[in-house]
Every structure is written in structure tokens, then in C-alpha cells.
Amino acid sequence: MMKIKKRVIWFLIIILSIPTLAFCQDDLQEKTKNLEDSIRLMLYKERPYFEVVNYGANRIQMKDSSSLDYFFEKLYALQTQKKEEKKQVKILHMGDSHIQADFFTGKVRRLFQEDKRFGDAGRGFTFPYSAAKTNNPFDYKTRYTGSWTSQKMVSNKDQSQWGISGINVETTNPKSTITLEPIEYNERKPSKIEKVRIYYPILNEELFEAVIIAPTNEIKSQKMHLDGYLEVIFSVPQTSISIGLDKTDDIQTHFILQGVSLETNDGGILYHAVGINGAETRHYLRCEDFETQLRSVQPDLVVISLGTNDAYPSRFDDTAFKGNLIKIIEQVRNINPNTSILLTSPNDTYRYKKYANYNTQKAEERLQELMREKSVALWNFYQIMGGFKSIIDWHKVGLGQYDKIHLSQTGYNLQGDLFYEAINEQYQKWIDKNRPK
């Protein structure tokens, strides 16, 4: 059936390419776009359809077709493994407020983990955003006791030892606690918790020590890692994680929590999402433990979704934006030069709800340059939306929010669908080329 579809597609493309057809250039371009949309809808099977979406642009762009080879090799090994092997593929998706809410990344995580080819290796990186007095993802609850203060990389007045999340919570009370409880969300039950990593600067002698509050007989092992985390493996799956503190020396005065990773011992996809409201590329360069925690996460794919806040001011330094991304790419490759890197362009926005933002197109152009110059992949969501002023159309059909910056929950779900389909399509092409039957 797929072979027949491909033949039909090529036939239609050939017909549209015949110069003798009496179409003017504009008509031909429009008909080609409509054909591309139809082809993609046919190949993607069932998906939500919206007239405002440029489905023909929904593809992974690469100068070098090998840009995602490392990730696809790992994905294929996971897909074809024996059950007892329990391999995991790790994805780190970093960004700003679009990522902190986890609507977009949550949908992608769900699609990967519910795909029978891959499986569920856990919720991944989490943070007690509620303790930091900011919005928490909806698939887990945060509870805490004691007084906690937040330190954010986006605040110039804040100074802290940040990791990949770019946000910390701190306390001076050794009796303070934090609990993370995954919950059912959108009819999806939470992943089981068989292993947890608590990230904090363990080499800082002035910090209290982190401990897991759980029955001793449910803890199989505990180990402190020099990469800056306490790893606890459970003998019984947990439904929530409670973190306590232990003051073991008079020199200890406070505690800094950088994040918590919730994992299983099964094979599957571990999709970490880290983002903070207002984040720009330059802010991630303030994170002292960024590379250290990258080494501990060992991502096979790093997705970078930044640019909305860089491009928001009227005076946008697109050269600095590109330079900061180069530094982030270099940090990733310092840890593993083979790690696949996928950039995503920011969505179209307005400033103050009424001024169309020309800078987003500049950001998209710099990302195109990076794709060509740094052998990274690009998912051009700006083009998929429809480009300049497209957020207006997205808002009209319920896909964008009134602020003309963020998408609605429906919009983020659609974005997740599109992103996953683009990756999956490129993965299938890779299999056809490198693992032919």
C-alpha cells in the first residue's frame, strides 16, 4: 500500500513539474503547496487538520543528512532490542516558557513513550516550580514544607549555581522538605518511579545533604555521584518522591536544589524537558553546572527551542543570538561530539499584543545559517505556522493565546503532533536508507 502511495505522489509531482501546463508561476507555487499538504496528510494518517497550518513545511531540515544519525542509531537499537536488554534513549529538550508549561514537550514525550516501538523509561527531569512560586506542569504536583526561595538564571539580581534547568530553590532550614507526586493527566497514568536522581552541588561543603524520605526496606541502593546528584534505586516502585535534608556538620548552612529526575529501570524513551519563563540564549550561559549535568544525563538528542525572548525587544541583536547558540552547541559537543542537535524556530509573535514582530524572521534566518554551518538539524515551526503575522490566524482558530506570544493548549498539542511526525518521517527515511529490508 505504501509503495502505491509513493508512486501516486511521484506521478503528481511530475505532472506539476511539466512546464507546458498553463499555470502562471504563482498558481503553480500554490498548487505545489496544496499538493505537499495533501501528501503529508496522506502519509501522517489521522491528525488534527487546520487550514492555518503549512503542513508542507513540516519536515526536518538538514544540510548534512547525517545530522541526526547518532540519535537514529540509538532509536533503531531501542526499537530492535530484546526485551531483557532494557536500553534507553535519552532526549533533552531545553527552552523557555513554551517548555516550562510542558504542553508541547509533554505531548511529544507521550507520543514517543506510547509508541510500541520504543517504550516508557520515565517522566525524566522535573522541578518543584510551585516551591519557586511559578507555574508547574500539570502532570505532577509539588508540595513543600519550610521556607524556600527561588534563584533564576533570567534574573540579573539572582546569583546561584545553576544546572540545566536554570532555576534553583534554596532553604536555610534543614527541616524543610519537598515532595513531587506524578498524577494522571489527559487520561494518561503517570510513569512508575523506580529510580530517582536529586541534582544539587554535592561538592559544596556548606550544603545540607539530601535524603530520600522512604521506608528503608524500599530503598535498594543509594550513591552520590561527582556529576552532582544523589541516585536512589528503589526495590518497590514509588508513587511520589519526598526529599528531606540532613545537617551533618556545623559548616553546613543551606541547601540548593537544582532538579529531580524520575526514571524507571525499563528500556524506552527518557524525555527530559527543561525550561524557564523568560529564558534567552544568554541566560543558559550563566549556568555553571550545565556541562556537568549534561554529562550525567548523556542525551542522545538535544533539542534547543529558544529565540522567542531574544527576538522580543525592538532592538534584537541577532548576531549575539547566533553566537550564544554556537556556545551552547559547543558545550553539548564538549560532552559528546556525536550527540545529535535539533534546533526549533520560535513561533510568530506580536509585541504588546499589537505590534507585529519582524525580529522572529531574523531569528529564523540565523537558525537557518546555523543549520548549514554547524551540521545541526532544524525544525522550522515559524514556517509551519505560516510565517509573519501567522499568530493572528492561529489565535482566530483557537490555537494561539490572546497575548499573541503563547499558543493555547490545543495549539501546543498540535505543535507536539507536528514535531513528532516530522521526526518520525525523517527516522523512517533513515531506516529505508540505512537499514533496508
Describe the function of each predicted region.
Residues 1-38:
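Bacterial Sec-dependent N-terminal signal peptides
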Residues 26-54, 341:
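Short N-terminal segments immediately surrounding and downstream of signal-peptide cleavage
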Residues 38, 65-67:
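Coil residues (strongly favoring Ser/Thr
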Residues 91-95:
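Short hydrophobic beta-strand that contains or immediately precedes a catalytic carboxylate
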Residues 100-212, 218, 222-323, 406:
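Conserved SGNH/GDSL esterase-like catalytic core that processes O-acyl groups on lipids
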Residues 102, 106-110, 288, 292, ...:
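Solvent-exposed, polar/charged alpha-helical surfaces in well-ordered, non-transmembrane soluble domains
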Residues 303-309, 330-365, 380:
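Active-site segments of SGNH/GDSL-like serine hydrolases
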Residues 348-437:
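Catalytic His-Asp segment of secreted/periplasmic serine-dependent ester chemistry enzymes
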